[in-house]
């Protein structure tokens, strides 16, 4: 946020990943670009989105180009925010001040802004995300083994990837 660049995570199915890759990390990752502006990001989306043969799903086409949609009035948005991190850490006072100031600015422009209390259980997320990510890593590396005809060894991947690969052999992502 403070580096002069803009990042956007498009919705699943917005940008094709190629005919042999259905989704990244079980749908948790998508493909896009880091740009210098929102306008540049919209232009990249205009060039990159669309249907691809073999995709399990796709995002609905926009009513206009993403570049054109940038200029429309979004109307009154309903915006929620949370200031208590799910991991028990505390926000830096300066960050908290900026978040609250941003909420006030958004509310003053007519949006409905509401601060929510975090009811998120980090252990449940960690367990479910871990199962999904580890299962995906296992499937990806097994596919690579089948393509190359060679087993993946500890020397082929980073330690965390190797540990996740080993864990994937004793859990089910289904």
Language model segments and positions:
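Proline- and acidic/polar-enriched loop/turn elements at helix boundaries
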Residues: 15, 21, 118-119, 157
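Flexible, glycine/charged-enriched surface loops at secondary-structure junctions
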Residues: 53-59, 107-119
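An alpha-helix initiation/capping motif
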Residues: 96-100, 123, 158
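Short helix-loop capping/hinge segments that flank enzyme active sites or metal/cofactor-binding pockets
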Residues: 68-83, 131-174
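A short helix-breaking turn/cap at a secondary-structure junction
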Residues: 2, 6-102, 143, 147-151
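A short glycine-/small-residue-rich loop at the edge of a beta-strand within enzyme catalytic domains
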Residues: 32, 90, 128, 132, ...
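Short low-complexity, flexible loop/linker segments enriched in glycine and/or proline
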Residues: 2-4, 123, 127-134
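Short polybasic/polar patches that bind polyanions
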Residues: 4, 107, 112, 142, ...
């Amino acid at each position: 946020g403070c580096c002069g660049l803009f990042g956007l995570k498009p919705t699943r199915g917005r940008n094709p990943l190629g005919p042999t890759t259905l989704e990244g990390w079980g749908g948790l990752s998508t493909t896009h670009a880091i740009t210098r502006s929102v306008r540049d990001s919209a232009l990249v989306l205009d060039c990159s989105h669309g249907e691809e043969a073999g995709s399990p799903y796709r995002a609905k086409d926009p009513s206009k180009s993403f570049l054109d949609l940038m200029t429309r009035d979004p109307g009154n948005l309903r915006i929620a925010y949370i200031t208590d991190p799910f991991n028990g850490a505390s926000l830096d006072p300066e960050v908290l001040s900026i978040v609250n100031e941003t909420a006030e600015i958004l509310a003053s422009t007519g949006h409905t802004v509401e601060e929510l209390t975090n009811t998120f259980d980090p252990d449940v997320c960690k367990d479910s995300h871990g199962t999904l990510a580890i299962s995906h890593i296992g499937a990806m590396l097994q596919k690579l083994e089948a393509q190359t005809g060679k087993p993946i060894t500890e020397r082929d991947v980073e330690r965390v990837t190797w540990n996740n690969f080993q864990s994937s052999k004793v859990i089910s992502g289904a």
